[in-house]
Structure formats: C-alpha cells, structure tokens
Design a protein with these regions (language model features):
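ATP-dependent carboxylate/acyl-activation modules
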Residues: 1-167
Length: 167
C-alpha cells in the first residue's frame, strides 16, 4: 500500500498517523476541514452500515457506533426516526444516507452539529444550506466499494489478520 496522506494526528493528539491505500478514490470531499484519523474510521463504518439498506435510510454514528438508524419512504422521515432514538448522541457525529440529500433534509439536519455528512450526492440547494457551516465535512460516496474493501485487516503482535467481511 502507498501512503495517501499524513494525518495531523492519530486517534489521540499525541499519536502520529498516516492513511495508506485508495480511500480518496472512494470519496470526494466537497467542503469542510481536513479529515481526521477518527473521521476516516467513522466514515468507513458508516459506509459499510448504509450499504446494508435499499430503502431511503439515515444512520447516525459516533465513534463507529450507530446511535440511530432508520429507513422510510424518504430521508426526512427516516431522519426523524433515527434522531428520535437518541437526541443527544448525534451531536458531533457522522450522518450517512443512501439517497441524494435535498433542501428539506439539509434544513432539518443543519440544526444540529455534525462532523461529517456522507451521501451519494447533494442538490445545489442542500449545498447552499450546508455551505454556511464551513467546518462541516461533506463527502460524496463514489459508488460501490473496491473489492479490497470487502476484507478486514487487524494488526496483531508480530503480524496481521485478514478475513472476508461478514456481509
């Protein structure tokens, strides 16, 4: 794997970190601050989670843990259901959807502080609303995941473990 980017720091500010591989082939950042180590981990977890759903779905994650997930006929209703599960945990979290983010969704979601919003696309009206939040990271998920993303790698003493993802 080639180094793609040196990160400001790792999971904690005293840790050095770098990103290796083709992460940025899978996502396009439209706005916001530079991605952190923790953002990249959360984006990965969010992307795997949302890939399990066909209907319009919203998932809210914090530290890779889903704190609200719902599917419905549209993203606004799905958001209301996902957010209702825990109205405090989403603060500073990651929001991922599997449909285009439109004005109605952007207006509702922009009322809380989020670190990252991931979607297949955003309408111009949604981008204008989110554009007022300069630090909010907006990410477009560029279609399907590469085949090497379907494997999990864990470091262990003296080596690595590699396994297929549990789909």
């Amino acid at each position: 794997l080639e180094q793609a980017k040196v990160l400001r720091y790792g999971e904690n500010p005293h840790q050095k970190a770098a990103l290796y591989g083709n992460f940025f082939d899978c996502f396009e950042q439209l706005q916001g601050k530079e991605l952190s180590f923790n953002n990249i981990i959360d984006i990965t977890a969010a992307t795997y989670l949302i890939g399990e759903f066909q209907k319009p779905t919203v998932a809210i994650l914090k530290h890779t843990n889903p704190c609200g997930v719902a599917s419905d006929e549209n993203l606004v209703i799905a958001w209301e259901k996902a957010f209702a599960t825990d109205k405090q945990a989403p603060f500073g979290g990651i929001i991922v959807v599997n449909q285009t983010v439109d004005k109605a969704f952007a207006e509702i979601v922009s009322s809380i502080f989020s670190e990252v919003i991931i979607a297949p696309s955003f309408t111009d009206e949604a981008l204008a609303i989110f554009g007022k939040k300069k630090n909010l990271r907006l990410m477009i998920a560029n279609g399907s995941l590469p085949a090497d993303s379907l494997r999990e790698v864990r470091s262990v003493i003296g080596g690595l473990l590699l396994q297929d993802r549990d789909m």
